[in-house]
Amino acid sequence: MMSDDLTLVREFATRQSEPAFTTLVERHIGLVHSAALRQTGDAHLAEEITQAVFIILARKAATLGPRTILSAWLYRTTRYAAADALRQQRRRAAREQEATCNPL
């Protein structure tokens, strides 16, 4: 019997059920990875974002409400995580550029 997403989230949140979390990851990894890849255009960065999003899910599972649509929550979280990653990448590139232009 396939459980719905929120049942699996509750199972993970209350019992730290690894099988429940694994099922959630298997169901949604394609959505999360493709959204991250579409936003960043970088396969390696998309993999990092995908891992980060599922870590966020693990940490916040207990806070998700009964009306949460998990796929929408994951997509939104992926978009935010990708935007943050791209900002960090731009800041790092700017610092490196500044260090190159202004040697000590």
Protein language model features and the residues they cover:
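N-terminal module of bacterial RNA polymerase sigma factors
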Residues: 1-30, 97
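Short, basic/polar amphipathic helix motif occurring as a linker/hinge flanking DNA-binding modules
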Residues: 1-2, 47, 63-65, 71, ...
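Conserved acidic
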Residues: 8, 16-24, 45, 49, ...
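Sigma70-family region 2
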Residues: 13-14, 38-43, 51-69, 88-94
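Amphipathic, Lys/Arg- and hydrophobic-enriched alpha-helical face
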Residues: 18, 23-43, 60, 75-78
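Short amphipathic alpha-helical surface patches that mediate protein-protein
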Residues: 26-29, 51-54, 100
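Conserved adenine-binding aromatic site and its adjacent loop/helix in ATP-hydrolyzing domains
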Residues: 55, 76, 97-101
